[in-house]
């Protein structure tokens, strides 16, 4: 019997440039819903997990996330918008979205 390998379609959320979203990697957990995030633009920001996502997404060091910098202090602070799963991170690597970050 010949095994057929079918590639499953994966829907992956991409950062929206028009909404000022950036890819980032969690570097350190700080507590009180705060994390240190290394962003794709080369800056390290203090990330906040908003209350609406606090119990829905659990983040760990090394997770790839989408962040949205604040309008005030945008170079220093941001909000976590989305966390990627392992299969989504593999897809992002294959497509070249994480080349500069990793």
UniProtKB/Swiss-Prot annotation:
Residues 10-85 form the S1-like domain. Keywords: Initiation factor, Protein biosynthesis. One of its GO terms (molecular function) is translation initiation factor activity. It holds the Pfam family eIF-1a. The keyword Protein biosynthesis applies. One of its GO terms (cellular component) is cytoplasm. SUPFAM superfamilies: Nucleic acid-binding proteins. The keyword Protein biosynthesis applies. It comes from the Archaea. GO terms for biological process: translational initiation. Belongs to the eIF-1A family. Seems to be required for maximal rate of protein biosynthesis. Enhances ribosome dissociation into subunits and stabilizes the binding of the initiator Met-tRNA(I) to 40 S ribosomal subunits. PANTHER family: EIF-1A (PTHR21668). HAMAP family: aIF_1A. This is Translation initiation factor 1A.
């Amino acid at each position: 019997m010949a095994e057929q390998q079918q590639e499953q379609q994966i829907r992956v959320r991409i950062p929206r440039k028009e909404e000022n979203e950036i890819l980032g990697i969690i570097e350190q957990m700080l507590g009180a819903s705060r994390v240190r995030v290394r962003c794709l633009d080369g800056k390290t920001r203090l990330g906040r997990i908003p209350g609406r996502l606090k119990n829905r997404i659990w983040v760990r060091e090394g997770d790839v996330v989408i962040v949205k910098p604040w309008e005030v202090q945008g170079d220093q602070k941001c909000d976590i918008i989305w966390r990627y799963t392992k299969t989504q991170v593999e897809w992002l690597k294959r497509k070249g979205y994480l080349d500069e970050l990793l």
